[in-house]
Design a protein with these regions (language model features):
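Conserved catalytic-core segment of nucleotide-activated headgroup transferases in glycan assembly
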Residues: 2-47
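Short hydrophobic beta-strand element within catalytic cores of glycosyltransferases
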Residues: 90-96
C-alpha cells in the first residue's frame, strides 16, 4: 500500500503535558509542507487535518497509510506508538530523549526538534 500521509500525531490537551508537546516542531513540519493528521483533541492550525476521536478501526486504516509519528517525551512506548511501529511507521523522537530508546531501535529517527535543517533527514527517507 502507498503511504500518502506524512504524519499522524496523537494530540491530547492536558495541563501537565503542554510543555512536552512539540508545538514548534509541528509548525516547522507544516512550513516544510508535510501532510499532518491530528487525532484526539483538535490542534488549532488551518494546515493540519483534525480527525478528533476516532475508532481503533479507522485509526488502523490511517496508520497503514502514514509514514511517521512523533513520540511523546513522557512515554515513547505508548500504545499509540507501539501500534504505529506495527504499521511500519517511523517514530520521530527529539535527540535529547534518545536515551529512552531501548526497544525497536530501528523504528526511531532521532532529530533535534530545535534545528529546522534536520527536517531534511525526514525528507530523505
Amino acid at each position: 500500500k502507498k503511504k500518502n500521509i506524512d504524519f499522524i500525531v496523537y494530540y491530547r490537551v492536558h495541563k501537565n503535558k503542554k510543555s512536552l508537546f512539540p508545538y514548534k516542531f509541528i509548525h516547522n513540519l507544516i512550513a516544510a509542507k508535510f501532510k499532518i493528521i491530528i487525532i484526539c483533541d483538535k490542534l488549532k492550525h488551518k494546515k493540519v487535518i483534525n480527525y478528533g476521536n476516532i475508532s481503533n478501526y479507522n485509526l488502523t486504516k490511517l496508520q497503514a497509510k502514514a509514514k511517521y509519528t512523533i513520540a511523546s517525551a513522557e512515554n515513547i512506548y505508548s500504545l499509540f506508538t507501539l501500534e504505529c511501529i506495527t504499521h511500519n511507521m517511523k517514530i520521530i523522537i527529539d535527540k535529547k530523549n534518545k536515551s529512552k530508546i531501548r526497544f525497536y531501535k530501528s523504528s526511531f529517527l532521532k532529530i533535534n526538534f530545535e534545528n529546522t535543517k534536520e527536517l531534511n533527514k525526514i525528507k530523505l527517507i
